[in-house]
Amino acid sequence: MLRRTGVLRVLTGACLAALLLLSLGATAGAKPRPGNGKGKGQVKVALCHKGKTIRVGFPAVKAHLRHGDRIGPCGLPAPAPGTARLTVIKHVISNNGGTKTAGDFTITINGVTATGGNTFAGSEAGVTKTITTFGAYSVTESSVSGYARTSASVDCAGTIASGQDKVCLLVNDDLAAQLTVVKQVINDHGGTKTPADFAITVNGVTVIGGNSFAGSALGTTRTLSSIGAYSVTEAAVPGYALQSASVGCSGTIALGESKTCVLTNNDV
């Protein structure tokens, strides 16, 4: 779980929105790219680090928070009297073929009253809500097929009082699909080949560790880093014919799915 220390002080109204977009490295109207949070195009988070505002990618946020940095630029004014503020940042990792972005997740603040409504679309740039009632609260989100929550920062639940500023960081990752290929060989006409003598290839999707591998009677399970239409084929082996291929040997595979292909060859 991500932890944040210190108090995030935020600006009000249009100034706040503009500052959040600027501090997170986004331009007005731009849609953050789905990705793994690394490299070119990643959305960056503003942190107050030793009195200086810096911007880092999401993978580095956790380490900075452990060392006492806080999310948000340095030196921002406090909330208005009699209110608190809660900022929700939604980060989405799509490194297994997913295409969802933060806006595809519906966020809800429970237990307290937020101006403008307690439910809103997620945003990598962050959505800041003025809180007008206080006490126990939690931040939840609607489930999105193919994605799982991987972390929620400490301020995604707890209690909030007048004058406080809190930041909730929710991170979801797309679930990799898996494909298991079982190779069966029947030798009832004098053949001596084993499953390992058959070279298997998965086509149409990207397989972590390589798309081609030796057959196995126990099954070879591979994780996919892309999804969609696929087929499983094998190299021809003299003296053997493909007797059957199960339904899982071709079709489409989606995020989080697990499919099994059984290929059976017989000596002729």
Name every feature range the model reports, one short phrase each.
Residues 18, 22, 80-268:
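Solvent-exposed loop/turn and edge beta-strand elements of beta-rich ligand-binding domains
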